[in-house]
Amino acid sequence: MQTPFPTLFKTAAAAASILIMNACSPASEDNAGQPESETGDGDSNAIAKAGFGETKAGEATEIYTLTNKNGLIAKVTTYGATLVELHLPDKDGNLVDVINGFDNVAGYEGEGNQYFGCTTGRVCNRIAKGKFTLDGEEYTLATNNDPNHLHGGGDKALSKQVWKAEPSADAQAVTFSLISPDGEEGYPGNLSMKVTYTLTDENELRIDYEATTDKATPVNLTNHAYFNL
């Protein structure tokens, strides 16, 4: 049975917030890689950048460590615009990482990765038999879940691509951007996307999505984090 997408989305935007408990002053923790550069004044918000390894295709990846004025920490990587770590205080005030993930890009490219923390799409979830009809035209997608298309498909799924990163001037956010060309994984239209992770001073981790396309196409982006609480 075909999956219809009758609605044209020219612009799609969404926001997700994770409310985090108030933090005590944290003990220091090791970063995933040695910082290469840092934004911030050292007394409040800060963003540190470090290498995260090379992909199998030889592309360099980076990891960004966001720290808010209360000491909470979030780590995100250019590979898949992925949330790698989120450090929160436990009942004793000690920081613990509550996100399941890997220490480098090799882990995310391995067989054991079940979309940990990544940005999934162009369409998250399954499209039955890898087919859909839009405006009277049938499209055939890459299949990667038996006969179905799952979380954007194969090697060019958003979760498997290296995104460009831009830290914010206020050291509270990192914006990842990517352009998926017309026909990639079988989808119509050139799709330009931005995913922004913001760690606020109110102890919120916010994820904002923006997508624009030049052709009718389905878009349904999300984050696939696993929480170890």
Regions found by a protein language model. Give the residues of each.
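Bacterial N-terminal signal peptides that target proteins for export
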Residues: 2-12
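Hydrophobic helical h-region of N-terminal Sec-dependent signal peptides
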Residues: 14-18
